[in-house]
Amino acid sequence: MDTSSYIFWDMSPDMFSLGPITIRWYGVFFALSFLCGLYLMTKVFEHEKKPEDDINYLFYYMIAGTVIGARLGHCFFYEPDYYLAHPAEIIKVWHGGLASHGGVLGILTAVYFYSRSRPEQSLAWVLDRITLPAMLGAGLIRLGNLFNSEIIGIPTDVSWAFIFARVDLLPRHPVQLYESIVYFLIFGFLMLAYWKWDWGKQRGLLLGTILTSVFSARFLLEFFKTRQADYGHDLPLSVGQWLSIPAVIIGVLLIFQSVKQAQLEKTS
């Protein structure tokens, strides 16, 4: 096979080293996602005249929920046999292994506990607004996956295929880039929806939009990925696709309910 026409990807996952300390690209993108998220939520709280001191508390809840949820999601959604046999490995986040579906569940749990401590900021109110930083963060983290040469696509002969030198010499779909681009586009749409179209006033509309769009895209893009779970290879759909279906259904229901509520308010 002539591979000269494809993109040869041999990027080191390490950004640089300072003595015994190594800074990895994935870690930089992960940290950047939270810093950008903190900035965005600060602007949202200023816009809606909420206590700025609450931003730090929400930030801590979000970090804990994202990391714990994403880690547990990877361990039990994708490699349950291994981690049940080696439970001590679960806490070794630095070895890699985070799942976006688990991250979503972790964020939902974290926001639930945060909103209970802030009665004036309901669960629905917070969830609608964290869609903005969540979507930007998702796009950045997928770039981190690209630098790690992980979550790779299936072999292909398309002209833009990547050869991940740290994996093999097969041209593959750069599915990390596909997802990242889609997530950045959804982020741009949500920014318009919140700042220009004022969708934040319709409870559940932003959250429903992100669940429907993100997990519909995720369902479709899974067809271009190699299977990540250590089971279910004989099933027609991947684990990621099965997990995406309920998220899409919930998103559609939230959009329907939000639009219906807005229509009732107009007629009342």
UniProtKB/Swiss-Prot annotation:
GO terms for cellular component: plasma membrane. Its main location: membrane. GO terms for biological process: lipoprotein biosynthetic process. The chain crosses the membrane at residues 25-45, 57-77, 93-113, 151-171, 175-195, 204-224, 236-256. It is a multi-pass membrane protein. It comes from Chloroherpeton thalassium (strain ATCC 35110 / GB-78). InterPro entries: Lgt. This is Phosphatidylglycerol--prolipoprotein diacylglyceryl transferase. Its EC number is 2.5.1.145. Belongs to the Lgt family. Signal peptide: none annotated. It is found in: Cell inner membrane. Keywords: Cell inner membrane, Cell membrane, Membrane, Transferase, Transmembrane, Transmembrane helix. Pathway: Protein modification; lipoprotein biosynthesis (diacylglyceryl transfer). HAMAP family: Lgt. A 1,2-diacyl-sn-glycero-3-phospho-(1'-sn-glycerol) binds at residue 142. NCBIfam families: lgt. One of its GO terms (molecular function) is phosphatidylglycerol-prolipoprotein diacylglyceryl transferase activity. Catalyzes the transfer of the diacylglyceryl group from phosphatidylglycerol to the sulfhydryl group of the N-terminal cysteine of a prolipoprotein, the first step in the formation of mature lipoproteins.
